[in-house]
């Protein structure tokens, strides 16, 4: 799956620099991440839930949602309820972790938020399922 202009790289501490990844280089998302993004952008509750392990943890902006029942309620409210969409701009693979940067949009209260709103999604995978997802609004101005 290709989702707009992206940059992707495997993290190598001694050789990785921002300039080593060409801007706007399209790259396929890891299959699990692609499934999550596709389900999010199509507002498909069941496909989105199929990406998570039974005992997964989602931490969205410092709020924990443990296990599929809690994650289902979070998805209904915070993704489907506000018609959230993701435009992936960068992916970094680090072992079984995928760090995805995306511009997000939807029908949520945007007062006081930057445009575009850029969020970082920290996926941890095991057995082709998301076992942990941490979503943060990182600061890039420091």
Sequence positions of predicted segments:
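A beta-strand edge to alpha-helix "cap/lid" segment located at domain peripheries
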Residues: 2, 11-23, 73-142
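A solvent-exposed, acidic/Ser-Thr-rich amphipathic alpha-helical stretch
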Residues: 45-49, 54-95
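Short, low-complexity N-terminal intrinsically disordered segments enriched in polar/charged residues
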Residues: 2-46, 50, 54, 142
């Amino acid at each position: 799956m290709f989702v707009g202009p992206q940059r992707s790289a495997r993290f190598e501490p001694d050789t990785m620099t921002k300039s080593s990844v060409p801007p706007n280089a399209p790259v396929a998302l890891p299959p699990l991440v692609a499934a999550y993004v596709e389900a999010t952008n199509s507002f498909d509750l069941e496909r989105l839930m199929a990406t998570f392990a039974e005992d997964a943890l989602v931490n969205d902006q410092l709020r924990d949602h443990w296990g599929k029942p809690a994650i289902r309620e979070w998805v209904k409210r915070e993704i489907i309820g506000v018609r959230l969409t993701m435009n992936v701009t960068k992916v970094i693979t680090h072992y079984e972790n995928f760090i995805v940067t995306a511009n997000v949009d939807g029908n949520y209260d945007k007062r006081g938020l930057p445009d575009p709103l850029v969020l970082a999604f920290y996926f941890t995978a095991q057995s082709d399922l998301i076992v942990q997802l941490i979503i943060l609004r990182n600061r890039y101005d420091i």
